[in-house]
From Swiss-Prot:
This is Gag-Pol polyprotein. Residues 486-504 have a biased composition (Basic and acidic residues). Residues 117-144, 479-504, 1451-1470 are annotated as: Disordered. Keywords: Aspartyl protease, Capsid protein, DNA integration, DNA recombination, DNA-binding, DNA-directed DNA polymerase, Endonuclease, Eukaryotic host gene expression shutoff by virus, Eukaryotic host translation shutoff by virus, Host cell membrane, Host cytoplasm, Host gene expression shutoff by virus, Host membrane, Host nucleus, Host-virus interaction, Hydrolase, Lipoprotein, Magnesium, Membrane, Metal-binding, Multifunctional enzyme, Myristate, Nuclease, Nucleotidyltransferase, Phosphoprotein, Protease, Repeat, RNA-binding, RNA-directed DNA polymerase, Transferase, Viral genome integration, Viral nucleoprotein, Viral penetration into host nucleus, Viral release from host cell, Virion, Virion maturation, Virus entry into host cell, Zinc, Zinc-finger. Gag-Pol polyprotein and Gag polyprotein may regulate their own translation, by the binding genomic RNA in the 5'-UTR. At low concentration, Gag-Pol and Gag would promote translation, whereas at high concentration, the polyproteins encapsidate genomic RNA and then shut off translation. GO terms for biological process: DNA integration; DNA recombination; establishment of integrated proviral latency; proteolysis; symbiont entry into host cell; symbiont-mediated suppression of host gene expression; viral genome integration into host DNA; viral penetration into host nucleus. Its EC number is 3.4.23.16, 2.7.7.49, 2.7.7.7, 3.1.26.13. It catalyses: Specific for a P1 residue that is hydrophobic, and P1' variable, but often Pro; Endohydrolysis of RNA in RNA/DNA hybrids. Three different cleavage modes: 1. sequence-specific internal cleavage of RNA. Human immunodeficiency virus type 1 and Moloney murine leukemia virus enzymes prefer to cleave the RNA strand one nucleotide away from the RNA-DNA junction. 2. RNA 5'-end directed cleavage 13-19 nucleotides from the RNA end. 3. DNA 3'-end directed cleavage 15-20 nucleotides away from the primer terminus; 3'-end directed exonucleolytic cleavage of viral RNA-DNA hybrid; DNA(n) + a 2'-deoxyribonucleoside 5'-triphosphate = DNA(n+1) + diphosphate. It comes from Simian immunodeficiency virus agm.vervet (isolate AGM155) (SIV-agm.ver). Residues 1227-1377 form the Integrase catalytic domain.
Length: 1470
């Protein structure tokens, strides 16, 4: 058999020859395969005898397994053969090669892992350096075989920790997918879900992964349907989609599917594939940059470009072939021109190593210097050969710029290309990897001395900041240069102060600014001769044309290299050169140079420095536009005095030098008036620009910060620092496309010349977009800084920053300085004089300490005469103080302002107001202080009744006051204290949500029985939180009781009043069941007053208990609300009478229906006053309401009933009487705006959409609250109604991809609000409530919830009138749509008509006049307008022609007053 065949005995050989090469194949293994395997062992350094034993086969597998995935076909065949031999040695029955491979993978689970498990700790670390440990840290992860069972091995904490750290550091970058693949190798779905569950802070990304899992699971269920019928006993079921995801399967089932099922289903690998699809989608969302957009910058190193390119490639969701094609084509195609030339020279398909080696240093200074040197050397050698200058001089050997050796050039250097850091100059790393100090604003001395760090003295616009030391270096800026030079500031780190005597001339010298948009040429005096020369920091020597300068004295011949080759020059030593105001001495070269050059030998002596600033160009620019159809301001500059013109010229000159303004010419068609006022110190002027016209035309902005932060909402900190951003607006650049609209003109005195025109380059003061853009930009900058400085708590309002921390003093100061440095890097200066480091800190009108806060001092002044303006300021002070001083009142002081309009009107004080003023003055004498918020402690709000309709409340934590406030708002003329108390609670709740984000526990001065008695009938409050009822006097009580049932045994008073609308005369009276009656004549009254007078008369003449029947809905509505105070004297008298009664029954009956005593009293008081009209169809209206529960407006319009009758029909309904009808307000909404929300009715989910402007609703029951169902419902709305804007909350179904895709497809703008925020989703929340109320009324009439929802929609849309126009919601919606169409059609017709001109004749005058503007065209005549006069001309005397006059463009206008006046006039007429 031979040596190789001895690997198997005869029995084993028989088994070996029965094993097939492939499943279901014909060929089987033969002896020749063993002989071939023995010959191949030498290739891998293995002995053929290893095939004879089980251990030997395992060693062979250990060597071949790493090579098998990427090996050749022969190597894979050898690996398969060894696996078959191993199974034969282990006496395991296998049918084919695939079964043998599966057994080897399952049982052995890679031999190298067994070695890892038995290797000692010292060797383990050594061996693991080259391989990746298993996720579980076990050799048999994820399972171990114990007998015939498989036991799960959980993931190790080390693996989970590595996964969490990877996600936190990479933030779902492209590296996450391979990291997950490596860590989840061999995991079960249970293990993978454990890896996902530890990512608690990335719910958005996990939701995306979850959606992918659901889609893939559903697809799996479709392609793998379960078998019909029950499974045989003991048979393992097939996994479904949810089983693979691990939601409906156990770990043991997952192991059985992977290892013992027939056929086996690797659910772990399938689930990994689904997760990888989701992660790839997350990577794409978190890395939106496409590989097509990755291009190499002009000076970007090729290595950095390659890093960015492959990072984008890894984030692309594409196949391997597509990525390979992208790499081969785009990597070279998107390189910069320098690298592209080199890469194309490498031939087809170069390797990445070859490309990186070839493009080292391309674009850097060393590369450019090498190219320049080689070019100059070639040119110089040619020139010297032509001139004969090279005779007798041996040519030096070439020197390599890469290795520094002689004998070869850099391009021939065999050594790798060396790289140097552009920051520190050291080799071995690039600038981006440099660990040295990153100075964003550096000054490089020309003479090569050590660089010093300078602070920026200018922000984006050039605003100066105070230096950190007292040592200042003088600046003399050039008139033509921008602010690019800064004062030097000595740094505390790695530097020491030198005495003045040791300072070099450079350090204490001055230097000037030079613009770089043209050549920096200066006139200097050399040897007494004035010469214009170029200041060149790149030139070593100073060289002057021989035609411009002749020097006396000795000289030496010299050849210097230039761009054009070598030059023969004369070298003069010790030549005096005067540059600016400095006298310098040095070497000057005279020769045939193309241009005079002052080199570094003189510039260094002059103290010249290159100042390179990291200005605010990194700040993102916010795009701004005008409103649709609006144009920029074109206002004439009004006259200014001479001193103001001079002041404006000086201010603008400074701003222009600092880069905040730019000059513009007459081609800019826009202008805004400018003026100036004196500052408070009267020594300086302040420039003001009247941007009112521009503000009208500018797009609307949303104030990103709705209010100022309150100290009570801040957490207590050990250390506090207050920082102010200097010249905040001037630090932020303005959109370049919008700058033209900010143009203004500085006139000249007596119009001696054209005015100087400027435009703003930064955010201007007074423009409405400046606050929003600054807040938004500064917020984004602070977000980046907060990620770095997590120890600091930063609170921002505009340019004021509150910075707190729990660190010690020195550490806190260091963090604050780091914060200031980061802001400075972004161009936001924080002047030292505005930094507050010691308490008390003055911030936003408060005084702050680390443990408490106070208000800044408030003093109430005493004046002889008070004007309206003075009182307004006084009320403002008291309202500001009311947030910390309890008990302050302003009601009587505010009454003094009623009816006053002029700010300078003198106000007379009332005794009540003076008493209130003195009381407030005493309260303010006692200083109050507040504490800071502690999140772990409960928040409580205590309310006190002050009397006179005013209330006070305090927010507390464990007895310490956080904040106080007052409430005195009264919406209605007649009200009671319980209604006001509900308003107080609402205000407190909203204030707590804004400041702390949570509702407090309320302590209210009311008894529970009193509140519940009133609340049972009170329906106008839509939101009342939970509270504690505290018996603290003075209590809120109900002063009288209205019974709901008639009082037996008491007389019934039928009351009524009547009034004549013309004469204003009327009668009021009553008649009782016992025949008692009384009528009173009234003068100058109304129907309502007469009705109330009648009730007052009945109360006066009745006993302690009384039954009163009225037909006045007005009086009924007032008295059933149980008011305790009123601005009406008559109602106050009625309240006083009702308080004295023990019990009162008040009932309403419809008028003029012949009802007993009501008809009699009606006739009695109406005699001679009004006409009585009895009404029918009430029964029909009641039947209609019983069926549809229509509101009173629909009943009044449909059946012709008075409002009071229709309202009473609704009030008498037992289902509609509980809470009445909601009070409708006005909603400012566009016709295309809808709101959508989900609510729950009877345990089912109902999705509701409301058209905000009309109140029309669409609703239906959906099976699940998912994005898919929501998108389906939205598609129905889009298909039925015109919708342009959808507003929802930020629930997961509304923020899902399905809804986003549907909004994109339907061109619907989607915005979200915050749940439970009083300012969000007001319309839809109200409609949800109304829909539930309607369903509650009709629920007994229908069987299913779905039917009830649709019936309720019909009733709401078609059976209830009211609101805008008194229409139903459906009528209102259709009316709005048709109105919009009509308006658009009419505007089109008007625009077409206005395009025509009319020539006409008048009377007998044969001369044609015109052209006039056509206003209207009829059948027999036309209406036209000429000048200001409208004329009607017969059709036969008019000729209508189209206006073909060419339109003037913006540049055609003359920008002079009066130019284009006719056009402006016509525009105004239209």
């Amino acid at each position: 058999m031979g040596a190789a065949t001895s690997a198997l005995n005869r029995r084993q050989l028989d088994e070996f020859e029965h094993i097939r090469l492939r499943p279901n194949g014909k060929k089987k293994y033969q002896i020749k395969h063993l002989i071939w395997a023995g010959k191949k062992m030498d290739r891998f350094g293995l002995h053929e005898k290893l095939l004879e034993t089980e251990e030997g086969c395992k060693k062979i597998i250990e060597v071949l397994s790493p090579l098998e995935p990427t090996g050749s076909e022969g190597m894979k065949s050898l690996y398969n053969l060894v696996c078959v031999l191993l199974c034969v040695h282990q006496e395991k029955k296998v049918k084919d090669t695939e079964e043998a491979l599966a057994i080897v993978r399952q049982c052995c689970h890679l031999v190298d892992k067994e070695k890892t498990a038995v290797t000692p700790p010292g060797g383990q670390q050594k061996n693991n350096t080259g391989g990746t440990a298993t996720p579980g840290g076990s050799q048999n992860f994820p399972a171990q075989q114990q007998g015939n069972a498989w036991v799960h091995v959980p993931l190790s904490p080390r693996t989970l920790n590595a996964w969490v750290k990877a996600v936190e550091e990479k933030k779902f970058g492209a590296e996450i997918v391979p990291m997950f693949q490596a860590l989840s190798e061999g995991c079960t779905p249970y293990d993978i879900n454990q890896m996902l569950n530890v990512l608690g802070d990335h719910q958005g990304a996990l939701q995306i992964v979850k959606e992918i899992i659901n889609e893939e699971a559903a697809q799996w269920d479709v392609t793998h349907p379960p078998p019909a019928g029950p499974l045989p006993a003991g048979q393992l079921r097939d996994p479904g989609g949810s089983d693979i995801a691990g939601t409906t399967s156990t770990v043991q089932e997952q192991l059985e599917w992977i290892y013992t099922a027939n056929p086996r289903v690797d659910v772990g690998a399938i689930y990994r594939r689904w997760i990888i699809l989701g992660l790839q989608k997350c990577v794409k969302m978190y890395n939106p940059v496409s590989v097509l957009d990755i291009r190499q910058g002009p000076k970007e190193p090729f290595k950095d470009y390659v890093d960015r390119f492959y990072k984008a490639i890894r984030a692309e969701q594409a196949s391997g072939e597509v990525k390979q094609w992208m790499t081969e084509s785009l990597l070279i195609q998107n390189a910069n021109p320098d690298c592209k030339v080199i890469l194309k020279g490498l031939g087809m398909h170069p390797t990445l190593e070859e490309m990186l080696t070839a493009c080292q240093g391309v674009g850097g200074p060393s590369y450019k210097a090498k190219v320049m040197a080689e070019m100059m050397q070639n040119l110089q050698s040619q020139n010297m050969v032509q001139q004969g200058g090279g005779r007798g001089r041996p040519r030096p050997p070439p020197k390599c710029y890469n290795c520094g050796k002689f004998g070869h050039m850099q391009r021939q250097c065999p050594e790798p290309r060396k790289i140097k850091c552009l920051k520190c100059g050291k080799p071995g790393h690039l600038a981006k990897d440099c660990r040295g100090q990153v100075n964003f604003f550096r000054v490089w001395p020309v003479d090569g001395d050590k660089t010093k760090k300078f602070s920026r003295s200018h922000s984006w616009g050039g605003t100066k900041c105070a230096p950190s030391t007292e040592q200042l270096y003088t600046l003399r800026p050039s008139k033509e240069a921008p602010a690019a030079v800064c004062r030097e500031r000595e740094t505390n780190e790695k530097s020491e102060q030198k005495p003045p005597s040791e300072q070099s001339r450079l350090e204490r010298g001055i230097f000037f600014e030079l613009p770089l948009w043209r050549r920096p040429i200066r006139t200097c005096i050399i040897g007494g001769t004035a010469v214009k020369a170029l200041l060149d920091t790149g030139a070593d020597d100073t060289i002057i044309k021989d035609t411009d300068l002749q020097l006396r004295g000795s000289w030496r011949p010299k050849i210097v290299g230039g761009i054009g080759g070598g030059l023969n020059v004369k070298e003069y030593d010790n030549v005096e050169v005067q540059l600016e105001d400095k006298i310098l001495r040095g070497t000057v070269l005279i020769g045939a140079t193309p241009i005079n050059i002052i080199g570094r030998n003189f510039l260094a002596q002059a103290g010249a420095k290159l100042v390179m600033g990291q200005l605010s160009q990194t700040i993102p620019i916010t795009p701004v536009r005008l409103k649709e159809g609006a144009r920029g301001p074109r206002l004439k500059q009004w006259p200014l005095s001479k001193e103001k013109i001079i002041a404006l010229q000086e201010i603008c000159k400074t701003l222009e030098e600092e880069g905040k303004l730019s000059r513009v010419g007459g081609d800019n068609a826009y202008n805004t008036p400018v003026f100036c006022i004196r500052k408070k110190d009267k020594s300086q002027w302040r420039m003001l620009v009247d941007f009112r016209e521009l503000n009208k035309a500018t797009q609307d902005f949303f104030e990103v910060q709705l209010g100022i932060p309150h100290p009570a909402g801040l957490k207590k900190m050990k250390q506090i620092t207050i920082i102010d951003v200097g010249d905040a607006y001037y630090s932020i650049p303005l959109d370049p496309e919008f700058r033209k609209y900010t143009a203004f003109t500085i006139p000249t005195v007596n119009n001696e010349g054209p005015g100087i025109r400027y435009q703003f380059n930064c955010l201007p003061q007074g423009w409405k977009g400046s606050p929003t853009i600054f807040q938004n930009t500064a917020s984004k900058i602070l977000e980046e800084i907060k990620k770095e400085l997590k120890q600091l708590t930063i609170v921002q309002y505009m340019d004021d920053l509150w910075v707190g921390s729990q660190e010690e003093g020195p550490k806190h100061d260091q963090l604050v300085q780091t914060l200031r440095n980061r802001l400075q890097e972004w161009g936001l200066e924080t002047p030292e004089k505005k930094v507050q480091r010691e308490p008390p800190f003055e911030w936003m009108g408060y005084k702050l300490w680390p443990h408490k806060w106070k208000l800044q001092s408030i003093e109430l002044e005493k004046k002889e005469q008070w004007t309206v303006n003075d009182l307004q300021k006084l009320v403002g002070k008291l309202n500001w103080a009311a947030q910390l001083y309890p008990g302050l009142r302003t009601k009587n002081i505010c009454k003094l302002l009623r009816g006053k309009k002029n700010l300078l009107d003198v106000v007379e004080w009332t005794p009540e107001a003076e008493a209130e003023y003195e009381e407030n003055k005493e309260i303010l004498k006692t200083e109050q202080e507040g504490t800071y918020y502690a999140p772990e402690k409960p928040l409580r709000a205590a309310v006190q009744k002050l009397g006179d309709g005013q209330w006070s409340y305090q927010f507390k934590q464990e007895g310490k006051i956080l904040k106080v406030g007052k409430f005195a708002k009264q919406k209605a003329t007649h009200t009671n204290e319980l209604r006001v108390l509900a308003g107080v609670v609402q205000k407190i709740g909203k204030e707590a949500l804004v400041i702390w984000g949570q509702l407090p526990t309320f302590e209210l001065p009311v008894e529970r029985d009193t509140w519940e008695q009133w609340w049972a009938d009170y329906w106008q409050v839509s939101w009342i939180p939970e509270w504690d009822f505290v018996s603290v006097p003075p209590l809120v009580t109900l002063w009288y009781t209205l019974t709901k049932e008639p009082i037996p045994g008491e007389d019934v008073y039928y009351v009524d009043g009547a009034c004549n609308r013309q004469s204003k005369e009327g009668k009021a009276g009553y008649i009782t069941q016992q025949g008692k009656q009384r009528v009173q004549q009234l003068e100058n009254t109304t129907n309502q007053q007469a009705e109330l007078t009648a009730i007052k008369m009945a109360l006066e003449d009745s006993g302690p208990k009384v039954n009163i029947v009225t037909d006045s809905q007005y009086a009924m509505g007032i008295l059933t609300a149980q008011p305790t105070q009123s601005d009406s004297p008559l109602v106050e008298q009625i309240i006083a009478q009702m308080v004295q009664k023990e019990a009162i029954y008040l009932q309403w009956v419809p008028a003029h229906k012949g009802i007993g005593g009501n008809e009699e009293i009606d006739k009695l008081v109406s005699k001679g006053v009004r006409r009585i009209l009895f009404i029918g169809r009430i029964e029909e209206a009641q039947e209609e309401h019983d069926r549809y529960h229509s509101n009173w407006r629909n009943l009044a319009d449909t059946f012709g009933l008075p409002q009071i009758v229709a309202k009473e029909i609704v009030a008498m309904c037992p289902k509609c009487q509980v809470k009445g009808e909601p009070i409708h307000g006005q909603v400012d909404a566009s016709p295309g705006v809808w709101q959508m929300d989900c609510t729950h009715i009877e345990g089912k989910i109902v999705i509701v959409a409301v058209h905000v402007a009309s109140g029309f609703i669409e609703a239906e029951v959906i099976p699940r609250e998912t994005g898919k169902e929501t998108a389906k419902f939205l598609l129905k709305i889009i298909g039925r109604w015109p919708i342009t804007h959808l507003h929802t909350d930020n629930g997961p179904n509304f923020t899902s991809q399905e809804v986003a895709a549907m909004c994109w497809w339907g061109k619907v703008e989607h915005t979200t609000g915050v749940p439970y925020n009083p300012q969000s989703q007001g319309s839809i929340e109200s409609m949800n409530k109304q829909l539930k109320e309607i369903i509650g009324k009709i629920r007994d009439d229908c069987q299913y919830t779905e039917t009830a929802v649709l019936m309720a929609c019909h009733i709401h849309n078609f059976k209830r009138k009211g609101g805008i126009g008194g229409l139903t919601a459906a009528e209102r919606l259709i009316n709005m749509i048709t109105t919009q169409l009509e308006i658009n059609t009419l505007q089109t017709k008007i625009q077409k008509i206005l395009n025509f001109r009319v020539y006409y004749r008048e009377g007998r005058d044969p001369v044609w006049k015109g052209p006039a503007r056509l206003i209207w065209k009829g059948e027999g005549a036309v209406v036209l307008k000429e000048g200001e006069e409208l004329k009607v001309v017969p059709r036969r005397k008019a000729k209508i022609i189209k206006d073909y006059e060419p339109r003037k463009t913006l540049g055609d206008e003359t920008h002079l007053e009066g130019a284009g006046g006719s056009d402006h006039q016509m525009a105004g007429d239209s």
